Amino acid sequence: GGTLALAIDPLDGSSNIETNASIGSIFSLLPTDGEAPFSQPGRNQLAAGTIVYGPRCQMILTLGRGTLTFTYTPSFGGFVEEARSAPIPEKTSEFAINASNYRHWDEEVRLYVDDCLAGAEGPRGREFNMRWTASLVAELSRILARGGVFLYPADARRPYRDGRLRQLYEANPVAFIVEQAGGAATDGIRHILDTAPATLHQRTPFVFGSAHEVQRIARYLTDPSAIGERSPLFGRRS
């Protein structure tokens, strides 16, 4: 018995509709203990999921015991489980960010992107590929399938000084799924799931994906000079 609180983004990636690119939905289920069920840490979520309306209609779901992937099968008339998602690889050679916002980012974010784009000749000593679909659910599906990291940092523009994505119904459910798949999700420094949104539409910076790379980004944001390959005491490291 009892009731649950449902937080949902019914149409993620709506700017992709005109171009027939992937869009989707994001949802989160929370307990209703207390007077403000939507103002509790994301770690209290009971379940979270995304649905991608793409070449396949795919649902990714977690109940807090790993991550499941389902595909809508017309002949069956419903969703059929594909498999439990394999753990997200700790390291990656792919990153997703909207590079058109480069001039608005903090210097530390620019430094991370510059180091990746410098490839084998740069301080990372290896090649990276940059991705961007303008669809959070599609980015999540890609990262679950083959690893990678997603960044949507805060920037200097007034509407986005606290980030752009909504914590309650975008960042929290995606972070829950990612952590259940062995990845990491932060606001750049702090774990998203350890913080509670004060309002329904509170924005947050968001970084998620391969745990090793998410941790590296946190070091760029806090003390980039301490990163091994930028220290004169060390050679290149990936």
Locate each region found by the language model.
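IMPase-like, lithium-sensitive Mg2+-dependent phosphomonoesterase catalytic core
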Residues: 1-238
